[in-house]
Amino acid sequence: MKNKRGVILISSQEEFAKEFGRLCKEFNHLEIYTAWVGNPGNIIPFSHLENLDTVEVYLGVSFDQSSPDGIQYLIDKKYTVTIIDDKFTYHPKLYFFKSKIGMALLMGSSNFTYAGF
């Protein structure tokens, strides 16, 4: 539901995945701030990243929940990956899209994992 300020309320994983895919096509830069990254073999959400020029990932590794394959995939794709020290519980779920035309922010409870999408 869109209001006058451009805020959209997303109430399901399906809506979140659809909006994430749309924004990956509309914008050219994405900053991901997430507690965990999943296995790239699950395709979603990794397939959407192909539409972007640049991707920065700020990733938590607490509780050994991030997939080593997912981390390696991001590194192999030459995305900027910053792993946050696991001495602290790093638990954001923010997706910040930017381009010359504007910006958008998705936030909520979805980690960058198949289950989150």
Locate each region found by the language model.
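PLD/PLD-like phosphodiesterase catalytic module centered on the HKD motif
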Residues: 1-117
